[in-house]
Amino acid sequence: MELTLHEARVIGCLLEKEITTPEQYPLSLNALTLACNQKTSREPVLDLSEAQVQDALDSLTKKRLISEQSGFGSRVVKYKHRFCNTEFSELQLSPAAVAIVCLLLLRGPQTPGELRTRSNRLHEFKDVIEVEDCIKQLISRTKPILKQLPREPGRRESRYVELFSETSANVVTTSDHTDKLHTAPVAALVEHGALVARVTELEQQVATLTQKFDELIASLT
């Protein structure tokens, strides 16, 4: 699946609210819009209108990732995800994996340390190692749903990105390109060094042959 930025935000919010405020789930359009536009725990911070959120919901409904629910005697339509862990979902994830995917959908690429710090309301990880173990499982799936990004200068940990959204696809492409740009000069320097060493070796061989030739000429005269 490939989600737009708005679709990814909607799915992330539904995953989050299902866990953190189950008494308010499913969400109405108004509640979902407020969740999408939160100023905290969101990167980037968005300012979506209800019409934009409705467009995202309509698109997700066509992708069979959202279902509508109307309460008895209520005209308010509420929405719940079919993204994972439902009878209609191909994707089945552990609570730990749901927490990680949810955070990556809502806040973009993050390190294991950041994921552990920010996940306390979604899932309690004992330590960073438990986060890393879960990440490895998600990467090693037959169809990986996470990817490790090249470690950035000054960072002790690599960041990880989900592979569901077009935004994350752009991040992966940019990171791969940057990594190649860093790798190319290093490879060029290595190749240049090898050429210099070879030229020096040949020059020494020529000098040795020249000396022997001069000695041979001298012995014949």
Curated annotation (Swiss-Prot):
It comes from the Bacteria. InterPro entries: DUF480, WH-like_DNA-bd_sf, WH_DNA-bd_sf. Pfam families: DUF480. SUPFAM superfamilies: Winged helix' DNA-binding domain. Belongs to the UPF0502 family. This is UPF0502 protein Sputw3181_2381. It comes from Shewanella sp. (strain W3-18-1).
